[in-house]
């Protein structure tokens, strides 16, 4: 029986360690307090606050598609944004122009850009580079406009909250050269993994979950958060409200069947956790229960098979971001100019033969 318990706790530790290693970052998103991050209706429509201030975000709307001919179902959404913003520059980036942009301005990333298995990953990453290079507002093609976006231009960085937790990358506004986006593009090569399911691969490597992980780490930087706050738009400003800036049309098509299963698991995580432990115990019992004889007690040192995933030396990619950060506020303040997100990394990276 002692040996059965040993194997049980051994495999339990293995599973828990692997779970924390792979999903520790996303799990922590459920515990984020958004209170200080929210961009509310009263904030945006209080014209007295910003009547004498210049816009932080340039008047540019960016969208991406394979070619210049977008699907008919999104023409109305595109037209609504163009018609409401005659004084804005509108840019539709195609697959060809996106790759040319990366090859010309960020050649150090071109190999990684070409290696992504899904086109949506390239569409994800290029929006980060575009907003960093030019600034402006990025909108997915299924996002239409209900009203002028001028009030949002006074906020140097804003995104929208997504469900069940974290932020989305389908609607974003950033000032040119925003340091948060610099951290985003620097971390892209470190999150480039294939999770064998299209939805998970996209979400973790380039999509909203990846962006949320970087944002979560960014919020913990005293200097970065104080100087370059990222505002999170409340749902009332996004859709289904008379205050909403946007209207969502028929959605994108890259979500495969695994997406629905992932969302179902997220909404019923407690049940799946219980069933997982129950199944694991039953399997271990039937594999070892009748075959093993009572064994001597396992020493405590023999049970430490894996190092803690919370260790500072852990290779977990959810913690890789912290090599650029410090938790000491005084230390950060004395070296703010030399922090990676304050350095001119673009010029530096183009002279290097390897990814950052």
From Swiss-Prot:
Enzyme Commission number: 2.4.-.-
Name of the top EC class for this enzyme: transferase
Magnesium keyword on record: no
GO cellular component: cis-Golgi network membrane; endoplasmic reticulum; endoplasmic reticulum membrane; Golgi apparatus; trans-Golgi network; trans-Golgi network membrane
Keywords assigned: Endoplasmic reticulum, Glycoprotein, Glycosyltransferase, Golgi apparatus, Membrane, Phosphoprotein, Transferase, Transmembrane, Transmembrane helix
InterPro entries registered for this protein in UniProt: Glycosyltransferase_domain (IPR051706), GlycoTrfase_DXD_sugar-bd_CS (IPR007577), Nucleotide-diphossugar_trans (IPR029044)
Pfam families per UniProt: Gly_transf_sug
Disulfide bonds, paired cysteine numbers: none
UniProt GO MF annotations: mannosyltransferase activity
Listed transmembrane segments: 4-24, 197-217, 269-289
Subcellular location as annotated: Endoplasmic reticulum membrane; Golgi apparatus, cis-Golgi network membrane; Golgi apparatus, trans-Golgi network membrane
Membrane topology recorded in Swiss-Prot or TrEMBL: Multi-pass membrane protein
Glycosylation sites: 52, 146
Main subcellular location: endoplasmic reticulum
Family: Belongs to the glycosyltransferase 32 family.
Protein name from the UniProt record: Inositol phosphoceramide mannosyltransferase 3
Source species of the chain: Schizosaccharomyces pombe (strain 972 / ATCC 24843) (Fission yeast)
Species classification: Eukaryota, Fungi, Dikarya, Ascomycota, Taphrinomycotina
């Amino acid at each position: 029986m002692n040996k059965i318990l040993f194997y049980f706790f051994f495999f339990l530790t293995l599973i828990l360690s692997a779970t924390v290693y792979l999903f520790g970052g996303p799990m922590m998103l459920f515990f984020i307090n958004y209170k200080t991050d929210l961009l509310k209706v009263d904030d945006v429509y209080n014209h007295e606050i910003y009547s004498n201030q210049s816009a932080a975000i340039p008047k540019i709307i960016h969208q991406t598609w394979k070619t210049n001919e977008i699907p008919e179902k999104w023409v109305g959404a595109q037209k609504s944004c163009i018609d409401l913003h005659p004084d804005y520059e509108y840019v539709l980036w195609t697959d060809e122009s996106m790759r040319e942009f990366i090859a010309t301005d960020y050649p150090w990333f071109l190999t990684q850009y070409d290696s992504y298995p899904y086109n949506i990953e390239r569409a994800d990453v290029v929006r980060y580079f575009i907003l960093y290079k030019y600034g402006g507002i990025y909108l997915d093609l299924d996002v239409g406009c209900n009203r002028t976006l001028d009030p949002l231009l006074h906020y140097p960085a804003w995104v929208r909250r997504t469900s069940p937790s974290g932020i989305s990358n389908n609607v974003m506004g950033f000032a040119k050269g925003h340091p948060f986006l610099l951290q985003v593009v620097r971390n892209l090569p470190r999150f480039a993994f294939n999770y064998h399911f299209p939805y998970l691969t996209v979400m973790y490597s380039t999509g909203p979950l990846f962006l949320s992980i970087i944002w979560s780490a960014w919020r913990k930087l005293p200097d970065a958060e104080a100087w370059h706050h990222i505002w999170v738009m409340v749902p009332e400003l996004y859709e289904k409200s008379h205050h909403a800036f946007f209207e969502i049309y028929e959605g994108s098509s890259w979500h495969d069947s695994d997406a629905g299963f992932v969302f179902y698991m997220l909404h019923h995580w407690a049940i799946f956790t219980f069933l997982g432990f129950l199944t694991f115990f039953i399997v271990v019992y039937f594999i070892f229960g009748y075959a093993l004889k009572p064994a001597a007690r396992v020493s405590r040192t023999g049970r430490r098979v894996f190092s803690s995933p919370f260790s500072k030396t852990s290779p977990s990619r959810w913690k890789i971001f912290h090599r650029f950060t410090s938790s000491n506020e005084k230390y950060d303040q004395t070296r703010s100019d030399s922090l990676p997100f304050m350095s001119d990394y673009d010029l530096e990276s183009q002279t290097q033969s390897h990814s950052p």
